[in-house]
Amino acid sequence: MFHMLTCFDLKPENTLEEFQQSLENYSSFMQGQGLGVGHSPIGLRQSDSILDTDEEREQKYFMLMHFRDRKQSDNAVAYIKSHEEPGKSLHLKAYSQTQNLIFISWEDID
């Protein structure tokens, strides 16, 4: 599987519940289009833990998006860049509620 980690903060005017709903709507749509296989629950960073050694980033939240493989991920990105509706609005709704985003991607080793 191929994965994308997103570390982010919410904009002050948005709630976690609003973002969770927007993310669920977007992710469900993308799955229905064959452009993803799901996402993780949203995590709350525990930066005061000894296990958290990342001193470069201060984002409060994180989540994973999962793809069958790199090709499906690339197809999802191409779809987003096409600005086709309703994906454009669903992506923008979720994306616009966040700030300070960092993305990291990887593929599982078999």
Model regions and ranges:
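Active-site-flanking beta-strand signature of metal-NTP-handling nucleotidyl enzymes
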Residues: 2-9, 62
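N-terminal first-folded block
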Residues: 6, 16-27, 40
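An amphipathic, aromatic/His-enriched active-site/gating alpha helix that lines ligand/cofactor pockets
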Residues: 25-37, 52-60, 64-103, 110
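Carbohydrate-binding/catalytic loop surfaces
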Residues: 44-52
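Acidic carboxylate-rich catalytic motifs and surrounding loops in phosphoryl-/glycosyl-chemistry enzymes
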Residues: 41-45, 104, 108
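Short, flexible beta-strand-to-coil junctions
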Residues: 8-12, 67-68
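Acidic-and-aromatic substrate-binding clefts and catalytic sites of carbohydrate-active enzymes
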Residues: 13-17, 47, 80
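Short, conserved charged micro-motifs
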Residues: 13-19, 71-75
